[in-house]
């Protein structure tokens, strides 16, 4: 969710990944998956031969992207993208970025990118429109409220049902409100998390639901008079997971997934999670 400005126009900003190597934290590197076969770099059918183009939204927020600059490789999703590129055999200067709004990226139709990282939860509905890579992060949803409000003392999901709640449209955060909290009043929906945060600050809603790492950033850096009430319990038998979005039927899906799987196996994903998302484990649990 983005987590997660007014509804952004689908304006694509291409930016070559040319940041100096010392701008990003080093990441563990195992054997590349690009040695032979269909996943060899020179056989990958990327939009631009010899380069791979990733996408994310604008603005792009911490802890997923630091400084609204994916090319610096800082932030969890930025670091994952560069680690995937390395596994596929791409040098840092062979990685490009473009900006695509969240909603546009998961709509059916040709994409202006090879893979998009923007806190996309893998759902059956979305899989009918786009491809997803193997998941790179298991996520929970969290509830934010003003520190001085009675909501801040809520300890159970049932305590939230009477509240005016809000979330970004089309997100699993909104779906969590509908499916898990089941509020008495229809939840408010917003085009972006920026609009949702403004509504919380203005008192139009009493609590906001976003993914947990985004909630940590909002409460610590943006809306300092708010607090994480708690994280919602896992929904269903399978955890909610983030995956990269690719064009439906993309020839790259299998190779990108193989790269993600290799990063999980060699410990890189765990290392990056500890580096960028360590505080997520400390949030209180709602029962």
Predicted regions and their residues:
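Extended ligand-binding regions for polar small-molecule ligands
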Residues: 19, 30-34, 78, 82-87, ...
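Extracytoplasmic small-molecule ligand-binding "clamshell" domains
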Residues: 26-118, 128
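Periplasmic-binding protein-like
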Residues: 58, 138-145, 220-261, 279-287
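Bilobed "Venus flytrap"/periplasmic-binding protein-like clamshell domains
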Residues: 59, 73-88, 120-122, 139-197, ...
């Amino acid at each position: 969710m983005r987590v997660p400005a007014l509804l952004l126009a689908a304006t694509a900003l291409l930016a070559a990944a040319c940041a100096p190597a010392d701008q990003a934290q080093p990441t563990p590197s195992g054997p590349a998956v690009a040695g032979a076969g269909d996943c060899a770099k020179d056989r990958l059918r990327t939009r631009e031969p010899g380069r791979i183009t990733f996408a994310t939204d604008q603005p792009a927020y911490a802890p997923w992207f630091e400084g609204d600059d994916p090319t610096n490789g800082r932030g969890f999703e930025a670091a994952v993208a560069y680690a995937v590129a390395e596994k596929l055999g791409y040098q840092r200067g062979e990685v490009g970025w473009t900006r695509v709004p969240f909603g546009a990226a998961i709509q059916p139709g040709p994409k202006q990118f090879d893979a998009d990282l923007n806190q996309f939860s893998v759902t059956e509905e979305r899989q009918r429109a786009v491809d997803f890579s193997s998941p790179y992060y298991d996520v929970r949803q969290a509830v934010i409220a003003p520190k001085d409000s009675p909501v801040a003392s809520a300890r159970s999901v049932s305590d939230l049902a009477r509240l005016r709640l809000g979330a970004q449209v089309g997100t699993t955060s909104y779906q969590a409100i509908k499916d898990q909290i089941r509020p008495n009043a229809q939840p408010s929906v917003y085009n972006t998390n920026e609009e949702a945060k403004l509504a919380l600050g203005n008192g139009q809603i009493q609590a906001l639901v976003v993914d947990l790492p985004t909630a940590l950033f909002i409460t610590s850096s943006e809306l300092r008079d708010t607090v994480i009430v708690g994280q919602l319990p896992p929904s269903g038998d399978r955890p909610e997971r983030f995956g990269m979005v690719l064009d439906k039927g993309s020839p790259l899906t299998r190779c990108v997934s193989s790269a993600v799987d290799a990063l999980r196996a060699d410990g890189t994903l765990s290392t990056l999670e500890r580096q960028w998302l360590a505080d997520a484990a400390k949030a209180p649990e709602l029962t």
